Amino acid sequence: AVQAMGDRHCAYVLYRVDIKDADMLDIKDLNKVYFDNVYVETKKPVAGGWYTDYIVDDGALYAAVSMDFRTDKVNRGNFDVTFKDLCSTDDEVLISKEWKVSIDLDYTPVSRRISSGRVIKVAGGRCRLKGIEISPISVRADFTRGRNVIMENISIDAVTLKSGENLADTSVSGGSSSGAFGRVCSMQFGKVVDIDDIESVTINGQTIRL
């Protein structure tokens, strides 16, 4: 692992994998190399995604693993990441094997909490937005339960940068959960951003400017 960044609820971990003896593996185009699967094992519930990107100039394969922990108690713990089967986009398995890497997760969470109290219209009624928690890698909004409101109809539609880019178009994970007292919706971005570059969050078609 070469870099880790996270907040109270999720994290990105970037791995560098050096590929040696490419000639022996008969790899003609190193841009075509990827892992068939990369998955995370922790003691806590986790969801997320991953992607790989080979940069020819530096001779390494990078695997970025995103994780949404569904809990705020994972940091300062450890987890395992398994890389399975080195493959080629030519539908060829170059090496059929699993490689497991263990890592201690220890980072300083960076996030900003914005209290709201705004009323959000939802099919069937209204509910109240308690607040938005935003970080360089994710956004999270929590709502109080409204009367006669179908809470499952609440969702984050867009996270818009000042440049006009919508981070929802490239989000890597997201989800929601409802309980007796309300609902929480979250979205993990596909890249790291500066919080000050985020202009607004749109929830159920209603835009909240930050």
PLM-predicted stretches and their roles:
Residues 1-210:
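Alpha-helical, hydrophobic structural elements that either
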